[in-house]
């Protein structure tokens, strides 16, 4: 996408590590939970893309220090962004830099009337973020487990701790991040 391109139906999730990292697992669970629990209740469905890198090129977010303290963490970002975090002459950015542009006065009446935000898009993403925060807060601790036997097209998973829960759901991923 180019500068000022808009995509109001997609959100990207960035997280650290390879396919099986706890961070990518959290990202996949957020996407799965959205597809299974939320999408049927929304008027404009969102496409969630799980990205390979930990964050966008030249950027970093609050999820990094959480990951550094061994918390599963991920970052939600818009599908397209204005700018690439460079600091060259004449560069403008609206992505929480020290030179943020809050908005502009499009009709020159002294009032900011364009905030560079689609508030409907923001609301849809807030629902996804809120649901993710809820499942992380309410969910059980991740159990230790072993795969004891591979049986035909399936496998047997043995939960070795956190056994107070009667049921665990085991998900298998595709060969891509999603």
Regions found by a protein language model. Give the residues of each.
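Active-site-adjacent mobile loop/cap segments within catalytic or ligand-binding domains
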Residues: 1-5, 50-140
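Metal-dependent peptidase/peptidase-like ectodomains
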Residues: 1-64, 69-73
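Hydrophobic alpha-helix feature that most strongly marks membrane-spanning transmembrane helices
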Residues: 35, 134-138, 175
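Proline-enriched interdomain boundary motifs that mark the N-terminal boundary
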Residues: 138-150
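A broad structural signal for short, well-ordered beta-strand segments within beta-sheet-rich domains
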Residues: 143-144, 163-167
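Conserved aromatic anchor
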Residues: 153-164
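Beta-strand signatures of extracellular beta-sandwich domains
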Residues: 169-173
């Amino acid at each position: 996408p180019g500068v000022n391109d808009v995509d109001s139906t997609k959100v990207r999730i960035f997280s650290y590590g390879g396919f099986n990292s706890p961070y990518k697992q959290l990202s996949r669970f957020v996407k799965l939970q959205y597809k299974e629990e939320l999408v049927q209740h929304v008027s404009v469905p969102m496409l969630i893309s799980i990205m390979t890198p930990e964050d966008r090129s030249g950027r970093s977010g609050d999820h990094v220090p959480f990951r550094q303290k061994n918390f599963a963490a991920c970052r939600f970002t818009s599908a397209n962004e204005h700018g690439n975090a460079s600091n060259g002459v004449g560069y403008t950015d609206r992505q929480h830099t020290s030179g943020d542009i809050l908005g502009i006065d499009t009709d020159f009446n002294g009032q900011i009337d364009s905030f560079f935000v689609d508030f409907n898009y923001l609301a849809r993403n807030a629902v996804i973020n809120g649901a993710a925060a809820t499942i992380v807060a309410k969910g059980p601790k991740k159990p230790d487990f072993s795969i004891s036997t591979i049986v035909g097209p399936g496998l047997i998973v043995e939960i070795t701790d956190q056994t107070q829960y009667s049921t665990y759901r085991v998900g298998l991923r595709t060969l891509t991040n999603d």
